């Protein structure tokens, strides 16, 4: 196992149920996954060291296409993770991240099932701090 941080491994951030497709990041994507793992450690601390379950992080083009996501998805470059936190709702996780001083690029409550968190694709870019909701009504600003 390749440990990226104390609590997150490369295998965890590249896991996919679509095993028929290769899901191996290149060196740039691995560097992004390291930054993402460091960010997830901060989220974990923010949430009182609660366990974070990663549903999806890095996605190769084939995996991304298989799940029906856009080519511009930050998952494609290793800068996004869809997470669940046992004992917390996605709304609670989203609110906690928004209220914090964490430098997130996006936080999205998706279908009340998970929280999408991302960091800037370029480590030198300023985080956009976009807070959104995606559900059957569409995409809108978090309020």
Q: Residue locations for each model-derived region?
A:
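Short beta-strand
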Residues: 56, 74, 106-110
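Acidic, His- and aromatic-enriched active-site or binding-groove loops in soluble protein domains
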Residues: 71-92
């Amino acid at each position: 196992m390749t440990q990226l941080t104390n609590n997150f491994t490369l295998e965890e951030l590249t896991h996919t149920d679509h095993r028929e497709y290769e899901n191996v990041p290149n060196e740039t994507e691995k560097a992004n996954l390291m930054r993402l793992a460091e960010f997830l450690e901060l989220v974990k601390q923010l949430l009182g060291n609660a366990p974070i379950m990663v549903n999806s992080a890095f996605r190769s083009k084939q995996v991304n296409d298989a799940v029906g996501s856009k080519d511009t998805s930050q998952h494609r470059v290793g800068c996004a993770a869809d997470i669940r936190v046992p004992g917390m709702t996605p709304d609670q996780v989203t609110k906690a991240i928004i209220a914090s001083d964490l430098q997130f690029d996006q936080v999205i409550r998706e279908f009340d099932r998970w929280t999408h968190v991302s960091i800037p694709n370029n480590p030198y870019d300023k985080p956009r701090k976009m807070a959104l909701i995606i559900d059957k009504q569409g995409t809108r600003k978090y309020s």
